[in-house]
């Protein structure tokens, strides 16, 4: 300790010399040195004092005077201070050190000297361990919490999440040095203890920089980390092999492919989201969505988010996000939302045919629809599968008619039906294998068709279909999935998201409460009409996603609006809206007659809403 103290003392003297030189009126160094030497009894606390003194630049002059004129007085003052600090423990004093030193850091000379002194001091004396900057501490906590929550979120039972976890662990181990860096910046203590030399250099570098710069760098670090995480999650997601090609596909035709079957879309979107969105944010969103979108597959929400991000139209993105919020809808909803522009045209394709199909298909029961679905799958597969969800059929049929009217979409419609098609599929992928098998069968076509099918159209029909169908089979699956997700959902991450504005949107996706905002937001603009339809759609459908009935109601509402909007939005679509309305009313009456309790209620609510 003696040698350490001596070194510190020398540093201290040098530092004071520099400080006083820097300060307006340099005091005779000899006096300062003399005062320092006179204070030999306190060599140990001197280092601590020096930060205290330097911390006050203005006062430092006075101090210099004091030292020159009345060293004893200063000594007593400093002694008190040192005693106090010693009581607090040297570590504490170190923290004082650090807290106080930043202010003077504005002066170049002082900054440099201080940083060197501190560096040495840190390495030699273990004061650094307690040396936590308060400001940094909070940020550290946040970051740590984020990483933990991510870990926790991803450490869910599902194999996919497990896989993701493993990947993340691997990645984290790779990127841990970086993370530790970041934390090191926040956590001088551990830094100094564990890797003193490196941290100290890091620290000195940071200290050399202005505090703002340090923060910036820290931010950068965190961004990088999040980026790695981002990459991670998409990779993990892409680890689902089947959906990888789809991902590629989705990426190629992000809008169209968004319609890609659930898992593919999910993955692709997830991947896309990191790709398209700013990395850090997208990752957060990704995970957040993953966690937060309970009803639908989180991936779907993430996917839709990625698509949102990827998709050129901002409004659409938002709505997509919302859609993804229902991920059950999200596949459709956001799919529709993203291609909505496309969808407008497709929808125009044959509103009449859509109406026709909805008419024909709606009438049949689920079984009939399913039979039809099987028989039609090739040709009318889109519409019939939709019908296949005959119970969804009223919606699905309208939807499917829309799908079928867009022949490319028709296939999508099956996807829809199936996966509600995609969304179900997504769900089924993550949620229920049994469903998945069925939707899986159709899902490839659905995927392709979905991308083909206008997302907006998808949106409509999926929501309808989704409602009734989901209400039954999917509602259970969804319940299951939701329970699982919910477990994951309410993680610290979620809480943090609640606090930070950047996550508000994701949160909205998750919570029905918030959804009304997007629900209303889109209505104003006609270009927004697409996005707004999508948005409404997604908001209403996601909102109702959990309750298929309410979902269908809000969806129908949003659908009605979006369709109207769509018609107003695109003249080509405008014919379609009428037919759509027709098919919708038809589906309404049909679903009513069908009296599948859920379908019925959804149709009823739907019709009532529409009215």
Curated annotation (Swiss-Prot):
Q: Which GO terms of the molecular function aspect are on file?
A: identical protein binding; mRNA binding
Q: What is this protein called?
A: Serine/arginine repetitive matrix protein 4
In this chain, composition skew of type Basic residues spans: 107-123, 131-189, 217-226, 483-498, 550-564, 581-595
Major location (coarse)? nucleus
Subcellular location per UniProt equals: Nucleus
UniProt KW keywords:
Differentiation, mRNA processing, mRNA splicing, Nucleus, Phosphoprotein, RNA-binding
One cellular component term from this protein's GO annotations in UniProt: nucleus
Composition bias of kind Low complexity appears in 190-202, 291-301, 390-422, 430-461, 522-549, 565-580, 596-611
Region named Disordered: 38-248, 263-611
Summarizing the function annotation, the protein's role is: Splicing factor specifically required for neural cell differentiation. Acts in conjunction with nPTB/PTBP2 by binding directly to its regulated target transcripts and promotes neural-specific exon inclusion in many genes that function in neural cell differentiation. Required to promote the inclusion of neural-specific exon 10 in nPTB/PTBP2, leading to increased expression of neural-specific nPTB/PTBP2. Also promotes the inclusion of exon 16 in DAAM1 in neuron extracts.
Biased amino acid composition, Basic and acidic residues? 203-216, 462-482, 499-508
Question: Might you name a Gene Ontology BP term for this protein?
Answer: nervous system development
The UniProt entry, under InterPro entries, shows: SRRM_C, SRRM_Domain-Containing
Q: Which organism is it from?
A: Homo sapiens (Human)
- Among the Pfam families in the record, one is SRRM_C
Which lineage do the record's taxonomy fields give for this organism? Eukaryota, Metazoa, Chordata, Craniata, Vertebrata
